[in-house]
C-alpha cells in the first residue's frame, strides 16, 4: 500500500470518527452532557379549569375564599363588636365557629338543573357560639344571597326544635390549649416526684403531651374529659407511648380558672388528685412502672431504615387524560358529578349521571364512629364521633404519588373554621383514572368457535383523606364503566393505645413494652339519595329459596329446586335491616319504568362490610349513633332530615341533637323519593403488625350501587376500550385489535410535574 492510499484511508477514518462523534453528541444533547428532550405525552398532568357555563350555576360547589370573606364581613357587621376571633375565644366569648355552604333544597336545585329555572339563592350556614350572652347558647344562621349577602336568618329552632345548649358545642383549639396550660402549669407540678420517677418529668420540659377522649362526661350537661398523657415523640406517633397517667378534667365553667381535676388514674389505680398521688408515692404506697423514653427512633417511626429502591410502577395517559375537572364538576365520556367537602360530615357528591342520565342526587358521608374498650378510663369510655371533630376540618393535603397517583388531578379546598379569615387546604381532593389490571369482563372460547372478547376495567376515582387524631381515613368514590358506583373507606394511621396492666389482654394485644393496642370498631354512615329513572321509586327485596319439587319426568322422585323470592317492601320499618340480622342478598330501588325485558329499572345496593356488633340500645349514648343499629335502611327523603348525625351529638350523646332512629317511623316507601342509609365498618383488634401503624390492606369496607335491569344489556358493550378477535384474524393487527397499536405508536414519556405536598397547618 503506497503512501497516498494510506493518507486517503486515514482521512476517511478521521471523517468517519468525526461523524460518529457528532451523532453521539447530538444524541446526548447539544453540550454533550445531557440526553435530548424526550417526546412527552399530551396533557401529562391535568389541572382544574374554571367553570365556563354561565347558564348553569355550580349549586354544590363549596364556598370560595371571596364568598367566605363576604359572609364573615357581613356577620361581623351584624353581630356587633363583641365578636372575638375563634382562635382566641374563651368559653365566655362570642365567636363565629364555622362558615360553610348551605345546600340548596332539592326541588329548587332540580328545577334549575332540569328545567332551566332560576337557580336557588346561594347561601352559607354559620355556627356561632354566644358564650357572652346571659343564657350562653349555640346558634345557626343562614346567610345570603352570595356573593353579596344582605340577610341572615336564625334557623336553630327550625332545624333542631329548640335552642342548642351551650355545653353541646365542639371544643375549640383555644379550649384545648387552656386545658393543657392548666395540666402542665398548675396540676402536674403537684406530682413532680412520682412523674420524674416514672416518666423523666421536669416542669416545663415538654416531654409529655395530652390526648383527648370523648364523650365528655356521663350525662347531659357534663363537660368533663379524660385526657391521657403520652411521651412527646417528635416525628413519630406519640399515640403508642402512654405513660399510664390519665386525668379527668372538668372544663364546664366559662372561666378557665375554675376548671378542676376530678379524678386521677395512674398505672392501674385511681386517686382523688395529683397531690394525693404524690403523697402516696412519697409514703412508698405506689408501685411505679418506669416507662422508658426511647426517643424518636425505633419501630414506631414511619421513616424507613433502608435506602430508596427502584421507582414503583407509574400509570400515565399516553394519549392525554380522558376526564376533566371544571370548578367542582368532573366530566368523563361516561360520568359526570359535582363534588364537595362538608366541614364536619366530609366528602360528598351530587347530580351523579351515567351517560347523561341522573342515577343519584346525592351520595355523602354522614358520620364516622370509633368505639373503644379497655381497662383504663380513657379507653373504656371512648366513643369518637368524628363528625364533631370535623372530617372536612381535618382533611389533609394529598401527597402526590402516595395518597393518589402521581399524575392525578389535585384540587384545593377553601374553608373558614375557628378563624376570622378563610384558609386554603391545597390538594384536598384528587381525581384520577386508574387501570385496575383486571378485566371488567372477558371470555376466551376454544369450543364450537374460537374467539376472545373482553374489556379492561378502567375506573374514575374521587378521593379525599381525613386524619382524626391518630387515625387516617381514605374516602373513595369509584365510578365503573358498567354504570356501577363503589363507595368505600380504608383506615390507616396509628392505633390508639393504653398502659398495659392487669387484665389488659381482655381488651386487645400487647404491641410493645407496657403498651396495649385497644380493641375498637370503625363504622361509617352514608346517605344515598338514588333517583332511579326519576323521583318515584320502590324498594324490592330478592333472595333465593330451595323448594321441594316432584321431578316432572320421574314423579316418584323429588328434588330441591332453587328459585328466586321477590317481595316489594312497603314501609320504612320493613326496609330497616338490623346490623348482624338477616337481610335480602339483593335489595334494590326501582322505578315505574321497565327495561326492554319488562323488568323494573333498578339499582342494587350491595354492602361489603364486616362491622362489629352495634352499641347495645340500653347504652346511655346509643341514641347519638342509632344509625349503627342498621346495616341498611330506606326512608322517605325529607328536607327536614338532611343528615343522620350532628356536629353536636358528640358532646351530648345522652340527649342527641339528631337521633337517626326517629327517621324510621313506618311511613310508606312505595312510589316516593327515597334515601338509602348505609352503614359500613369493621372490628379491629390491634396486633403486632399494627406497628408502626395500621395498613390499608384488609381494612377497607363500603358498598356498591350496581345496575339491576336498569339497562337492556351491559352498557360497557359499547366501550371504546373493548377488545375482540377471532381465530382467523390477525390479533397483532391495529385494524383488528387497538392494543396491537401500542408498540407502533410513537413512544412518549409522561410529563411529570414537580413533587408536591400541601404543607402543614401550625396549631
Curated annotation (Swiss-Prot):
Q: Please name the GO terms that the record assigns under molecular function.
A: copper ion binding; primary methylamine oxidase activity; quinone binding
How is the protein altered post-translationally, as described in the entry?
A: Topaquinone (TPQ) is generated by copper-dependent autoxidation of a specific tyrosyl residue.
Q: Which cysteine residues pair off into disulfide bonds?
A: 198-199, 404-430, 734-741
Q: How does it sit in the membrane?
A: Single-pass type II membrane protein
Give the sugar-modified residues.
Answer: 137, 232, 294, 618, 666
Annotated active site residues, numbered on this chain, are 386 (proton acceptor), 471 (schiff-base intermediate with substrate)
Enzyme Commission designation: 1.4.3.21
The reaction(s) annotated as catalysed by this protein in its Swiss-Prot or TrEMBL entry are: methylamine + O2 + H2O = formaldehyde + H2O2 + NH4(+); benzylamine + O2 + H2O = benzaldehyde + H2O2 + NH4(+); 2-phenylethylamine + O2 + H2O = 2-phenylacetaldehyde + H2O2 + NH4(+)
Q: Which residues cross the membrane?
A: 7-27
Record's GO cellular component terms? cell surface; early endosome; endoplasmic reticulum; Golgi apparatus; membrane; plasma membrane
List the SUPFAM superfamilies hit by this protein, alphabetically. Amine oxidase catalytic domain (SSF49998), Amine oxidase N-terminal region (SSF54416)
- Sequence similarity: Belongs to the copper/topaquinone oxidase family.
- Subunit architecture: Homodimer; disulfide-linked. Probably forms heterodimers with AOC2.
Q: What is this protein called?
A: Amine oxidase [copper-containing] 3
Source organism (scientific name): Bos taurus
Amino acid at each position: 500500500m503506497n503512501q497516498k492510499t494510506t493518507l486517503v484511508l486515514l482521512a476517511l477514518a478521521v471523517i468517519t470518527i468525526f461523524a460518529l462523534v457528532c451523532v453521539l453528541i447530538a444524541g446526548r444533547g447539544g453540550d454533550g452532557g445531557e440526553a435530548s428532550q424526550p417526546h412527552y405525552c399530551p396533557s401529562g398532568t391535568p389541572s382544574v379549569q374554571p367553570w365556563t357555563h354561565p347558564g348553569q350555576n355550580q349549586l354544590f360547589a363549596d364556598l370560595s375564599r371571596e364568598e367566605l370573606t363576604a359572609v364573615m364581613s357581613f356577620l361581623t357587621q351584624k353581630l356587633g363588636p363583641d365578636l372575638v376571633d375563634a382562635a382566641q375565644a374563651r368559653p365566655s366569648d362570642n365567636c363565629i365557629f364555622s362558615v360553610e355552604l348551605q345546600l340548596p333544597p332539592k326541588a329548587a336545585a332540580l328545577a334549575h338543573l332540569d328545567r332551566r329555572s332560576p337557580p336557588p339563592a346561594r347561601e352559607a350556614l354559620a355556627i356561632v357560639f354566644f358564650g357572652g350572652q346571659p343564657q350562653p347558647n349555640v346558634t345557626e344562621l343562614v346567610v345570603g344571597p352570595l356573593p353579596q349577602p344582605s340577610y341572615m336568618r336564625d334557623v336553630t329552632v327550625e332545624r333542631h326544635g329548640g335552642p342548642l345548649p351551650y355545653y353541646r358545642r365542639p371544643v375549640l383549639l383555644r379550649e384545648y390549649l387552656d386545658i393543657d396550660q392548666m395540666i402542665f402549669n398548675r396540676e402536674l407540678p403537684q406530682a413532680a416526684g412520682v412523674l420524674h420517677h416514672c416518666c423523666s418529668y421536669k416542669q416545663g420540659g415538654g416531654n409529655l403531651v395530652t390526648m383527648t377522649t370523648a364523650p365528655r362526661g356521663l350525662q347531659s350537661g357534663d363537660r368533663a374529659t379524660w385526657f391521657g398523657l403520652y411521651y412527646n415523640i417528635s416525628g413519630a406517633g406519640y399515640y403508642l407511648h402512654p405513660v399510664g397517667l390519665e386525668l379527668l378534667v372538668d372544663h364546664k365553667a366559662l372561666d378557665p380558672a375554675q376548671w378542676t381535676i376530678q379524678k386521677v388514674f395512674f398505672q392501674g389505680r385511681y386517686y382523688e388528685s395529683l397531690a394525693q398521688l404524690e403523697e402516696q408515692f412519697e409514703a412508698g404506697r405506689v408501685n411505679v412502672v418506669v416507662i422508658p423514653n426511647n426517643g424518636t427512633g425505633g419501630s414506631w417511626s414511619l421513616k424507613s431504615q433502608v435506602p430508596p429502591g427502584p421507582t414503583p410502577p407509574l400509570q400515565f395517559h399516553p394519549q392525554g387524560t380522558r376526564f376533566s375537572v371544571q370548578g367542582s364538576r368532573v366530566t368523563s365520556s361516561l360520568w359526570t358529578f359535582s363534588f364537595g367537602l362538608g366541614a364536619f360530615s366530609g366528602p360528598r357528591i351530587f347530580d351523579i349521571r351515567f351517560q347523561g342520565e341522573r342515577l343519584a342526587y346525592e351520595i355523602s358521608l354522614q358520620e364516622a364512629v370509633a368505639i373503644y374498650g379497655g381497662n383504663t378510663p380513657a379507653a373504656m369510655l371512648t366513643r369518637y364521633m368524628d363528625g364533631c371533630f370535623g372530617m372536612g376540618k381535618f382533611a389533609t393535603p394529598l401527597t402526590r404519588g402516595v395518597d393518589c397517583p402521581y399524575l392525578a388531578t389535585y384540587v384545593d379546598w377553601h374553608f373558614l373554621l375557628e378563624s376570622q379569615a378563610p384558609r386554603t387546604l391545597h390538594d384536598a381532593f384528587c381525581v384520577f383514572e386508574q387501570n385496575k389490571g383486571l378485566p371488567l369482563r372477558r371470555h376466551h372460547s376454544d369450543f364450537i368457535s374460537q374467539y376472545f372478547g373482553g374489556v379492561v376495567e378502567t375506573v374514575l376515582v374521587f378521593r379525599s383523606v381525613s386524619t382524626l387524631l391518630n387515625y387516617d381515613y381514605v374516602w373513595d368514590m369509584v365510578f365503573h364503566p358498567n354504570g356501577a358506583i363503589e363507595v368505600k373507606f380504608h383506615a390507616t394511621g396509628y392505633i390508639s393505645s393504653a398502659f398495659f396492666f392487669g387484665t389488659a389482654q381482655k381488651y386487645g394485644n400487647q404491641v410493645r413494652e407496657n403498651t396495649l393496642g385497644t380493641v375498637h370498631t370503625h363504622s361509617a354512615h352514608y346517605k344515598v339519595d338514588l333517583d332511579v329513572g326519576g323521583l318515584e321509586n320502590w324498594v324490592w327485596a330478592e333472595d333465593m329459596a330451595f323448594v321441594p319439587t316432584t321431578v316432572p319426568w320421574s314423579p316418584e322422585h323429588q328434588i330441591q329446586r332453587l328459585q328466586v323470592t321477590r317481595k316489594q317492601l312497603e314501609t320504612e320499618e320493613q326496609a330497616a335491616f338490623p346490623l348482624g340480622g338477616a337481610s335480602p342478598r339483593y335489595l334494590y330501588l326501582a322505578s315505574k319504568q321497565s327495561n326492554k325485558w319488562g323488568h323494573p329499572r333498578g339499582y342494587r345496593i350491595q354492602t361489603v362490610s364486616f362491622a362489629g356488633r352495634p352499641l347495645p340500645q340500653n347504652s346511655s349514648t346509643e341514641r347519638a349513633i342509632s344509625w349503627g343499629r342498621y346495616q341498611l335502611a330506606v326512608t322517605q327523603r325529607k328536607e327536614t332530615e338532611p343528615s343522620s348525625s350532628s356536629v353536636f351529638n358528640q358532646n351530648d350523646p345522652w340527649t342527641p341533637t339528631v337521633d337517626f332512629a326517629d327517621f324510621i317511623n313506618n311511613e310508606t316507601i312505595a312510589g316516593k323519593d327515597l334515601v338509602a342509609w348505609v352503614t359500613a365498618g369493621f372490628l379491629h383488634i390491634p396486633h403486632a403488625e399494627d406497628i408502626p401503624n395500621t395498613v390499608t390492606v384488609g381494612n377497607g369496607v363500603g358498598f356498591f350501587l350496581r345496575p339491576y335491569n336498569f339497562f337492556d344489556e351491559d352498557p360497557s358493550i359499547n366501550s371504546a376500550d373493548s377488545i375482540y378477535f377471532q381465530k382467523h384474524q390477525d390479533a397483532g393487527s391495529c385494524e383488528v385489535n387497538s392494543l396491537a397499536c401500542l408498540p407502533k405508536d410513537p413512544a412518549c414519556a409522561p410529563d411529570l410535574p414537580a413533587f408536591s405536598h400541601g404543607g402543614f397547618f401550625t396549631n
